Amino acid sequence: MENTQENPTDQTTEETGREAQAAENAAPAAEAALAEAQAKIAELQESFLRAKAETENVRRRAQDDVAKAHKFAIESFAENLLPVLDSLEAAVGDTSGDLAKVREGVELTLRQLTSALEKGRVAALNPVGEKFDPHLHQAISMVPADQEPNTVVAVLQKGYTIADRVLRPALVTVAQPK
């Protein structure tokens, strides 16, 4: 009688051989996948470093642009003041003694200065008749007046703003409560 049963040892050897063959076939594929992953990592690292350098360059350029904007804004403002300086120097050098002429020159110089300040977005505060605002005004005194309480009655010294920011509050007298 012939033995039709397979030997369990033969079956185990055959399975081990197939597993070994599969492992040998998988090794190059795994190595290729590893090499591909390492290449991708290197590419991403390089891309990250470039992006980081570009971000740093953009930040530096932005800082330079802001510094230049400040510099040129001041330069423009100073340029607008030069005609005022010229007028004042001419007035100081005038020896004619004609007071009417000097007064006319001073008024012209004041208009030049006001114009230069307006170009620099500096505006005067003249709050007579307005409600007292502690952000814009500084009350020096309170006086009895016909106006409503806390209304500005007189301006002792003008205040100034630049681009909606207070440079100097107006010194004012305010109507006291009745």
Swiss-Prot record:
Query: Which intervals carry biased composition (Low complexity)?
Result: 19-31
Q: Does the keyword Cytoplasm apply?
A: yes
Q: Sorted alphabetically, which InterPro entries does this protein's record hold? A: GrpE, GrpE_coiled_coil, GrpE_head
Q: Which GO terms describe its molecular function?
A: adenyl-nucleotide exchange factor activity; protein homodimerization activity; protein-folding chaperone binding; unfolded protein binding
Superkingdom of this protein's organism: Bacteria
Chief subcellular location equals cytoplasm
Q: Does the keyword section mention Ubl conjugation?
A: no
Where does this polypeptide localize? Cytoplasm
Q: Which UniProt keywords apply?
A: Chaperone, Cytoplasm, Stress response
Q: Name one GO biological process term.
A: protein folding
Q: Which GO terms describe its cellular component?
A: cytosol
Q: Where is this region: Disordered?
A: 1-31
- For bias kind Polar residues, which ranges apply? 1-11
- Read off the NCBIfam families from this record: PRK14139.1 (NF010737), PRK14140.1 (NF010738), PRK14150.1 (NF010748)
Per UniProt, subunit arrangement is: Homodimer.
Check the record and name the HAMAP family matching this protein: GrpE
Return the PANTHER family for the record: GRPE PROTEIN, GRPE PROTEIN HOMOLOG, MITOCHONDRIAL
What is known about what this protein does? Answer: Participates actively in the response to hyperosmotic and heat shock by preventing the aggregation of stress-denatured proteins, in association with DnaK and GrpE. It is the nucleotide exchange factor for DnaK and may function as a thermosensor. Unfolded proteins bind initially to DnaJ; upon interaction with the DnaJ-bound protein, DnaK hydrolyzes its bound ATP, resulting in the formation of a stable complex. GrpE releases ADP from DnaK; ATP binding to DnaK triggers the release of the substrate protein, thus completing the reaction cycle.
Q: Which family does it belong to?
A: Belongs to the GrpE family.
Q: What is this protein called?
A: Protein GrpE
From which source organism is this entry? Burkholderia thailandensis (strain ATCC 700388 / DSM 13276 / CCUG 48851 / CIP 106301 / E264)
